[in-house]
Amino acid sequence: MAPVSIADLVAALPSEDSWGPATPSDNMLEGVPYAPFSKGDKLGRMADWTSDSKDRDRAGRQAYNRNYRDQQVYGAGTSSLFNVQVAEDESSFSVVDNTRTTTKRTFGRGGGTVFRGRAQRGGAGQRGGRAGFQRVGAGRGQGGDRYYDNRGGRGNRGRRSGWKDYDKPQRTREPSVNVRPDWTMLEEVDFSRLSKLNLEAPEGEDLDSYGFLYYYDRSYDKAPVKNAERRLQALDRAAYNVTTTQDPIIQELAEKNEATVFATSDILSMLMCAPRSVYSWDIVIVHQGNKIYFDKREGASIDLVTVNENAADAPLEVTDSSGKQESLNTPSALALEATFINHNFALQTVVESEDSKVGFSHPNPFYNASEETEPLASKGYKYRRFDMSLQEDEEPLNLIVRTEVDAVMKNPVSGEEQQLVVKALNEFDSKAPGSGGALDWRSKLWSQRGAVVATEMKNNSIKLARWATQAILAKADAMKLGFVSRANPRSAAGHVVLGVVSYKPRDLAAQMNLNLGNGWGIVRTIVDRIQALDANEEEDKVTKYVLIKDPNRPVLRLYSVPANTFEEDDEAADEQEEKATEESEE
C-alpha cells in the first residue's frame, strides 16, 4: 500500500465543518464575536487577585454571601479598571508624636446612669413643671428634664467608658441630713431654673452694730522672705457663730416688727449662691406668725469651709482600709482643716491693742465675762435691713440679716477707717489627687499670682462667691484673702502664711461673674413659696421646713417637717455634754 501523506489527509477532511464544538451564530455581529451587556453594569476584571481577603470583616454566612460571593461575575466587579494608581500609597502614613501627654482622671463626671434611682423621685419640678417656684419679675421660669453638672459633666447623657472604669471610685456623696419618714417633699427645683431668677439688688441700711474690731496688721501684705514664712498660730479667743433663732438681737427686732424675714450672712450667702454648690447642705426654715427665719442645725455643714468643691477632680472620700496619708485629703478632713485655718488666720492678722481698737455702738451680745475665761476675739456684728418688695406687693417685705466684719484698717490716702472681711485659702498638696491642677503656691504665688487666683476661683467658686456675698451684705470696704499652705504636705498639723491679696468685694464678684440679682431672686422666690404654703394656717401656728441640696444632683428639695424636728437631737446632745462634764469633774 502506497504511503499517505499528511497533506492528503487534510485535503480529504470536509471543508464545511471546523474542528471542535459547533459555533453558535446568535453571538456574532457582522462576523465579530459579540457579548450582550448593559451600559449600567460596571466593567470588571476576569480575576482580581489583589482584592481584600474574604476573611476580613466576615460577620456570618449572610454577610459573606452579600459582600464576597460572585464578585467576579461579569458586570459585577467592584474594582474599576480606570482608577488612577497612585505612585505611593499614603493610607498607612501616620505622624509619630513624641510629646508627653498628661492623663486626666474622668471618673464620676456626668454619669447619668449611676444615680438613676434617685432621679425617679420628685414630681412636676423634675419634669420641668412650674409647681410653686416662679420667676420674680418679667418672664416665666421654664425647667428642663436635663440636669447639667456645674463642673462640666453632662449629667443626663453620661460619658464614654474608659480603661479600667470599673476600678475607679464613683463620686457618690451622702446627704447633709437624712430624710426621715415623717417628712413630706413639697417642691423640687433644679439649678437651671434657679439661675433664671432675678431681683434688682436692694441697697441695705444699718440698724445697729455690736462688738469691736482690732486694726489689721499691714505687714502680712508684704511678700514673705524665702524660707522665713510666718507660721499659723492657734489662738484661744472667744468667737461665736449663733444661729438666727437664738440671736437675742434678732428676737428683739422681730418683736418690734422691724422686718418679715430674718437670717444670718452665712446662711443667706449659701442660699444666694446655691447654683454654684456641689456638696450637700441644708437650711431650716421656721415660719411663725408672719415672720420667717432662715435657721441652721447644730453642727450643720454650712459652718464648714469646703476645699476644691468645684474642681473637676474634686477630693474623694476614702474607705476605712485606706492609709493615714489618704485620709488627710478627704473632703471632710479638708473642710475641718480649712475651718480651723480661717478661724485662726483672722485672729492672727490683727494687732490686739486695747488702746487702738474700734468699738461699735454696743458690746458683743453673746459674750458673758463672768462665764468666759478666754479673751474676746475681734469681731463686729452689723444688723442690716434690705427691702425686697415689688411694686405689686400690698405690704413691704423687708429682710434683716446679721453680718460680720473681722478687722479695720485706715485708708492710706484719705485716712478713713475701712472695715475688712478676712478669709484664707488653703493649699494641702498640689500633687495629690483632688488638687484641681493648682500651681505650687510657694514658687508661683508672687510670680504668677493671677494664674493662682484664677485657679482658685475655678476650684472654689462656691466658697469665694459666699465670701464676696457676705462682704457685700456687710458693706465691707475690702477683703483680705490669705494664702495658707501646709508646712509639710503630708501633715495637717502645721501651716505657714505665704501671702495676702486685697480685693474690693464688688470687684471680686465681678471677676467671678457673680450675679447678686440672681441671689436676691432666689431668696424672694423661696419666701413667696413659704408664705403661699401657710396662707390658710392659723396665725400663731409654727411650721417648719427643711431645704436640702441633693448630694449628687444640682437640685434643691423643700420638705415639710414636724415642728419639733431637730429639737430632740439638740436636747440629747445637751444631755451628753452635761454627762461628760460631770464625769470630768469627778
From Swiss-Prot:
Compositional bias per record (Acidic residues), positions renumbered to this chain: 566-577
Top-level taxon in the UniProt lineage: Eukaryota
Location within or outside the cell: Cytoplasm
RNA gate: annotated span: 301-315
Region of interest: Disordered: 16-37, 104-176, 563-586
Composition bias, Basic and acidic residues: 162-174
Gly residues bias (residue ranges): 108-131
GO terms under cellular component: cytosol; eukaryotic 43S preinitiation complex; eukaryotic 48S preinitiation complex; eukaryotic translation initiation factor 3 complex, eIF3e; eukaryotic translation initiation factor 3 complex, eIF3m
Keywords: Cytoplasm, Initiation factor, Protein biosynthesis, RNA-binding
Keyword RNA-binding applies: yes
GO MF annotation list: mRNA cap binding; translation initiation factor activity
UniProt GO BP: cap-dependent translational initiation; formation of cytoplasmic translation initiation complex
HAMAP family per record: eIF3d
Free-text domain note: The RNA gate region regulates mRNA cap recognition to prevent promiscuous mRNA-binding before assembly of eif3d into the full eukaryotic translation initiation factor 3 (eIF-3) complex.
Family in the record: Belongs to the eIF-3 subunit D family.
Subunit structure: Component of the eukaryotic translation initiation factor 3 (eIF-3) complex.
Job description of the protein: mRNA cap-binding component of the eukaryotic translation initiation factor 3 (eIF-3) complex, which is involved in protein synthesis of a specialized repertoire of mRNAs and, together with other initiation factors, stimulates binding of mRNA and methionyl-tRNAi to the 40S ribosome. The eIF-3 complex specifically targets and initiates translation of a subset of mRNAs involved in cell proliferation. In the eIF-3 complex, eif3d specifically recognizes and binds the 7-methylguanosine cap of a subset of mRNAs.
Protein name (Swiss-Prot/TrEMBL): Eukaryotic translation initiation factor 3 subunit D
